[in-house]
Amino acid sequence: MDFMKEYEKWLASPALSDAERAELESIRNDPKEIESRFYGPLEFGTAGLRGIMAVGLHNMNIHVIRWATQGFAQVICAEGEEGKRRGVAICMDCRNHSMEFARAAAEVCAANGIHVRIFESLRPTPELSFAVREYRCQAGINCVSRCLVTGAPAWGTAPAFRPAYQI
């Protein structure tokens, strides 16, 4: 992947806010920073989608959340109308834009015709597990943060986006 082309594509996107565009403009003369943000997409690991909060393809931000949720929604839609009717439960914790990310995930799912149950306030992870079973949801999405290991950089926590799918 040509990270400079990807950077320019993002910079030209009408989906960016003024603040996001300014953030990308601020790194225009820093090829190492541009490469770190655009060398490839953020990948799912054992704890879900996790990354540093910043604008870019390889960072945690609202655009990456929407992209990941769209892929997840396609999996649910492949189950047919029953999967869409059963829908998803979505919860969040109190850190790092969790509520914003949860709402964005809900919007993407709803736009795909998937029934959404989103908690109105912060909830612990076990409550999401309970909700998925109690409401017989097709899936659950948890927008949370996890502390990083000792010696982590100053940014301290990394948000995690963890969709879960069960058949």
Enumerate the language-model features and the residues they cover:
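Residues at secondary-structure transition points
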Residues: G51-L57, R146, T157, R162
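Short helix/loop capping segments that flank catalytic or ligand/cofactor-binding pockets
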Residues: I52-A54, M99-E100, T150-A152, Y165-I167
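Gly/Ser/Thr-enriched, mixed-charge loops and adjacent short helices
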Residues: E33-F38, L42, P153-I167
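An N-terminal, well-structured beta->alpha segment
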Residues: D2, Y7-A105
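Ferredoxin-reductase
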Residues: K9-S13, G83-P159
